[in-house]
Amino acid sequence: MKSFKFMVFISVIFSLVFLAACGSSNNASPDVGAGGDEPQAEEYYTVEHAMDVTEIKGTPKRVVILTNEGTEALLALGVKPVGAVQSWLGDPWYDHIAGEMDGVQVVGTESAVNLETIASLQPDLIIGNKLRQEEVYEQLKQIAPTVFAETLKGDWKENFKLYAKALNM
């Protein structure tokens, strides 16, 4: 019986030494070409929307929003746009969002967006609406990747999901 306990003891010790050796870290510096300090390429993703399928690079940082509904949705998602259409009843923003919109450039109204102002903001994403801006979609997508919701009426939750997807959230 003593020899059996001794053999179990030796096996346990051997196993612990073996596992410790396998788990040791190698402190050698990474190969230069193996992604050490080189920035990773941003990935592209696609968003299917009312007008097309749009490919977007990385996570957009400079967003222009072309609907009042969209402005409030972006703010709810924690995204402050660089440009937005004027609120219907605000000067230029609704009172309840005015504090969050400080520094945001007005880019026209929902029914009359200013393409030159939008282009000057150098957005990496434009979010609009087919019902309001279908006529300028081709021009907008030349400025930046552009995603349009189908309508302003109906299920706001669907538009919200589309905006979140366009923002890579």
Task: List the predicted regions and their residue ranges.
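Bacterial Sec-exported substrate-binding components of ABC uptake systems
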Residues: 2-13, 19-69
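Stable alpha-helical elements in mature extracytoplasmic
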Residues: 70-73, 114, 132-136, 156-159
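Extracytoplasmic substrate-binding proteins
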Residues: 135-169
